[in-house]
Amino acid sequence: MVSEVRAQYEAYPYPTRDPAEEKTRLITGSPSHVLEVDHFVFGGARDWSRPLRVLVAGGGTGDALIQLAQQMKNAGRAAEITYLDLSTASRAIAEERARVRGLGGIRFVTGSLLNAAEYGEFDYIDCCGVLHHLPDPAAGFRALLAALAPGGGMGFMVYAPYGRSGVYPLQEAFATLFDGMVPEARLNAARKIMAGLPEGHPFKANINLGDHKDSDAGFYDLLLHSQDRAFDVTTLCDMLEATGWHLSGFTMPALYDLGRLTEVPDHLGRVERMALAEKLNGTIKTHVGYAVRGSEARGQGTGRNRALIPHVKGLRAADLARAVAQGQSPKLSFGGLRARLSLPKEAARLIAAVDGRRSLQEIAQATGTDPIGMGALWSRIERELGDHGLLVYSSILRR
């Protein structure tokens, strides 16, 4: 099975990337946005005078590697990054992307994440879209924990079942039909069948999926992968706990907030609430989040600590502040979620003061907001923005 997976990524490195485009754009996302790493792994208060030792486990064509290396360079912070992947074709693309950007401090290794500890001890591990492709995912979780330095953590993405409806029956059918065929032949045969699917087919009805439309590599990874499983929230949390990890948080908490969908029975625990929200939502196709060592379980950054430095992520703080001051309720649409931000006009002055360098205490002083007013307003801001992945805490820009 491992040889089939390797053959797939040698034939179709994923995701499809053109290194020449590094001259004109930086692909960012979750996990491994550097602000998120600080927020979820280090409580928003990492000592950035120390180099960040990073393992990108299953680095593919380099999205996480390039994002993190470039953001560290932009912030003037030191990083020692190890890229690890089975595919030499994927590695070649990642190396060229780094070369085009002039990024240094990267060690490229061809190998398995099951041997992660052989390559050192790491403060942060990225493992995006890999663990669900292992024959024994638990072995992968344990192998990464063995490579984790004290106080460190991991950013992960694993597939979720409900937003991928229609995928797995097709995968099973194609695996039987095309057994023994080379990747190129499998792809051509599958495309012919897909062209004839009835309009009412569950896969065609699933508007959350798009990889099969983007490229040959995307089609193959979605529908022809030889080793693929999905984790619902309960299974994922059980897996993390069983392998020595603790869930720090998902990057989009609103997706897992049962209270946004219905009244919450008092007897439900945290995981039960998230699991029910996942089922009611029905559109979550990946779980993206961060985890720390179970024996070092700790919370993510929170506004209760006024020494932390907030960042508005994904949009301009000034633009958001202007909209809030005008009484607008900006629309949000991502991850299967459609919502509107609802903030009082008084919150605008606090949002406008967020510059990635001032602490909450300094923002309160600069805006003349008393402690009680600050607490009330900021809790609203944190819930509205933080739950939608738009607010994190990090000291990376503070000198």
Residue ranges and their predicted role:
Residues T61-R77:
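Conserved SAM-binding loop of SAM-dependent methyltransferases across substrates and taxa
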